[in-house]
Amino acid sequence: MSLLDCFCASRTRVESLRPEKQSETSIHQYLVDESAISRPPPSARASEVICSTDVSHYELQVEIGRGFDNLTSVHLARHTPTGTLVTVKITNLESCTEERLKALQRAVILSHFFQHPNITTYWTVFTVGSWLWVISPFMAYGSASQLLRTYFPDGMSETLIRNILFGAVQGLNYLHQNGCIHRSFKASHILISGDGLVTLSGLSHLHSLLKHGQRHRAVFDFPQFSTSVQPWLSPELLRQDLHGYNVKSDIYSVGITACELASGQVPFQDMHRTQMLLQKLKGPPYSPLDVSIFPQSDSRMRNSQSGVDSGIGESVLVSTGTHTVNSDRLHTPSTKTFSPAFFSLVQLCLQQDPEKRPSASSLLSHVFFKQMKEESQDSILPLLPPAYNRPSASLQPVSPWSELEFQFPDDKDPVWEF
């Protein structure tokens, strides 16, 4: 059966999905000669998985975001029989075009097909009339993009970036091993649970290299609805020429995401579309120090041997404004440093020639991630604000599902993306 032979039988009927059990050569001095580090955190126990398809079992608490081009609302909800907090994504299938329905089908079937702790899980999928309901674990920290907006507007520390990227790239490596290109690797598609588990979402953009039982070396399909993800897309994907693109396109997106996490801003974000495309396709190779690719700000990067060093040689000093966030444990100093290993990682990912970029497996062996071998999954928690584990006592559940009428205004930024 093709991966696109989804369980979405029609616009108004979806069969319930329930989870079922089921060393590369160094290319750079910073890519160590060892097998890829693998420390997958445990996935949810069977007793914790919510499989109910009865809509009355879910008490919607609050809308926490939207996605899928504003067609999907994302809610924090309580599974009343167990008291477990879950995420409920609700999409009106009648509002979806055929292309969007195919994207939904792809996300639903692939979430069921893939089983990896660093890939976002759908516990169950069902319909209520023409509304598609997707039940998944509640990720208490939301997305890395939301963390940037709320707590780290000037960018994250190198240690936090390492923890987040390591988990996300592990999920990406799993997809690549299964012959799939993600095509939408970015901070808003990286989710973090309350216990520090990092997962990769955004499967609706995914494309398979497998066709008729054979794995192709390149694909030529241009992703639908790509306008919002263009800053992260690779030059060869945007070029749309006879050479096509492959999994190395995702590695370029990892480099852009690393810059996004480090600066708090998306490279190319404020550029006119034509200017962005020209710079990616014809411009000279750039690095995290190339301020011309970032939105205008007061932040300035410069080389320095002073300041707090990360422990790996000479550091790069980033001047930012001092600010204190809501948690006493979080404080962004007036200067933060990035090691040569971090810049090596970014520059490797942003190579214009995709053949010069490392694979996801090789990237996990990069010296930037070397410390992850000695750190546990919960080592990320001291770097984050307190997790949102339960609704506030003053927060009242929204109206019963039968009384809700969903209208999604265009002026609200999505916190989570489908």
UniProtKB/Swiss-Prot annotation:
Disulfide topology: none
GO BP annotations listed: activation of protein kinase activity; cell morphogenesis; cytoskeleton organization; JNK cascade; negative regulation of extrinsic apoptotic signaling pathway in absence of ligand; protein export from nucleus
Gene Ontology, cellular component aspect: aggresome; cytoplasm; cytosol; nucleus
A Pfam family: Pkinase
Keywords: ATP-binding, Cell cycle, Cytoplasm, Nucleotide-binding, Nucleus
Superkingdom of origin organism: Eukaryota
Cellular localisation: Nucleus; Cytoplasm
Matches recorded under Gene3D superfamilies: Phosphorylase Kinase, domain 1 (3.30.200.20), Transferase(Phosphotransferase) domain 1 (1.10.510.10)
Residue sites binding ATP per the record: 64-72, 89
Principal place of residence: nucleus
Xref: InterPro entries: Kinase-like_dom_sf (IPR011009), Prot_kinase_dom (IPR000719), STRAD_A/B-like (IPR047173)
An example molecular function term from Gene Ontology annotations: ATP binding
Protein kinase domain location: 58-369
Family of the protein in this entry: Belongs to the protein kinase superfamily. STE Ser/Thr protein kinase family. STE20 subfamily.
Function statement: Pseudokinase which, in complex with CAB39/MO25 (CAB39/MO25alpha or CAB39L/MO25beta), binds to and activates STK11/LKB1. Adopts a closed conformation typical of active protein kinases and binds STK11/LKB1 as a pseudosubstrate, promoting conformational change of STK11/LKB1 in an active conformation.
Entry note about domains: The protein kinase domain is predicted to be catalytically inactive.
Quaternary structure and interacting proteins, as annotated: Component of a trimeric complex composed of STK11/LKB1, STRAD (STRADA or STRADB) and CAB39/MO25 (CAB39/MO25alpha or CAB39L/MO25beta): the complex tethers STK11/LKB1 in the cytoplasm and stimulates its catalytic activity. Interacts with BIRC4/XIAP. These two proteins are likely to coexist in a complex with TAK1, TRAF6, TAB1 and TAB2.
Name of this chain's protein: STE20-related kinase adapter protein beta
Species annotation: Mus musculus (Mouse)
